[in-house]
Design a protein with these regions (language model features):
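A conserved regulatory-domain signal marking ACT and ACT-like small-molecule sensing domains
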Residues: 1-94
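Short beta-strand/turn micro-motifs composed of small residues
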Residues: 10, 100, 127-128
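Conserved beta-strand segments of alpha/beta enzyme cores
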Residues: 30, 122, 143-145, 197
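Short, glycine-rich nucleotide/cofactor-binding loops
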Residues: 96-105
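Histidine-anchored nucleotide/phosphate-binding helix
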Residues: 105-115
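Short internal beta-strands
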Residues: 121-132
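Donor/substrate-binding cores of folate-linked one-carbon enzymes
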Residues: 129-130, 151, 155-158, 175-293
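Adenosine-nucleotide cofactor-binding segment
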Residues: 138, 142-171
Length: 293
């Protein structure tokens, strides 16, 4: 069975859905899942489809030919619709690289979820500016790379070199970089190179409590809700398109340490859920917002 995910954006117009479905049918595919949304303010149309076709035999060359043919047919059928973006994605296990610093909760959770098959991904490697997480990562037989950060420019060059070497070794391109509590600020050049391909998680106290100890600040203010935000990374610090958020109610019984532990739990859950959405090609980015199916 040959299966593709189609991600289509365009200026909303009459006849758009009909043109898409007719093209898919003419190419011999069956639509097994369809989600669509129109932003009424922007007049922007979003559509995600899962389509299938019986084909034998199936090899890499045939899959690539079919992908090109389908994309060409869609662009031709929709050429009169404006602001058009079309993604034709062959369903496959995505290749990801994890970046971390010292904290283990998000990294360990992702390692377990990938190992257990909950996340359809292959972890090419883990990069960290500390050695402390090496024993954890190597328990999963995943390569661990230490990239010290005495100078941020040199550190980024080393990270990029590691990524390139991993891609060459596996003969693939990394689909996604996941910052599992990677506590470094990435440069504009780095984020542009991987636009909408870097996933980050942070506590949702920003921007109210900025600094090294947000939970202490939140405790002193007596906050009643803690949470986490998963987003794509762009050149603006913690301001990229938001993919997923969640919160947890707390009360006066929560100490700073209890808040911190609860915060870790919600961070790893939100990151894992957001990563699953991205791996399944459910996230559309338009301007600085997302549509998630």
């Amino acid at each position: 069975m040959l299966e593709f995910i189609l991600k289509i954006q365009a200026r909303d117009s009459k006849g758009l859905v009909s043109a898409i479905s007719t093209t898919i049918a003419n190419k011999g595919y069956n639509i097994v899942k369809n989600d669509e949304f129109v932003d009424p303010l922007k007049q922007r149309f979003f559509m995600r489809l899962k389509i299938q076709k019986e084909m034998k035999p199936l090899n890499t060359e045939i899959k690539e030919q079919e992908e090109r043919s389908l994309k060409t047919a869609l662009f031709k059928a929709l050429e009169n619709f404006s602001e058009l973006l079309i993604g034709v994605i062959l369903t496959h296990k995505k290749n990801i690289i994890l970046l971390a610093t010292k904290e283990s909760h998000c990294l360990g959770d992702l390692l377990l979820r990938v190992y257990g098959g909950e996340l359809n991904a292959q972890i090419l490697g883990v990069i960290s500016n500390y050695e402390i997480l090496r024993p954890l990562v190597e328990k999963f037989d995943i390569p661990y790379f230490y990239a010290p950060c005495v100078d941020q420019i040199l550190h980024e060059k080393e990270v990029l070199a590691i990524i390139k070497n991993l891609e060459l070794k596996h003969k693939v391109s990394a689909d996604l970089l996941v910052l599992a509590k990677y506590m470094r600020i990435l440069s504009h050049d780095f984020t542009k190179r991987y636009e909408n391909q870097i996933l980050n998680i942070h506590h949702s106290f920003l921007p109210a409590f900025i600094g090294a100890n947000p939970y202490q600040q939140a405790f002193e203010r007596g906050v009643k809700v803690i949470g986490a935000t998963a987003h794509f990374v762009n050149e603006s610090l913690d301001a990229g398109p938001i993919i997923l958020q969640d919160t947890l109610p707390i009360n006066h019984n929560y100490s700073v340490e209890k808040m911190r532990l609860a915060g870790k739990d919600i961070e790893k859950l939100v990151l894992a859920r957001a990563l699953k959405l991205v791996l399944e090609d459910r996230v559309f980015v338009h301007e600085n917002k997302t549509v998630v199916f």
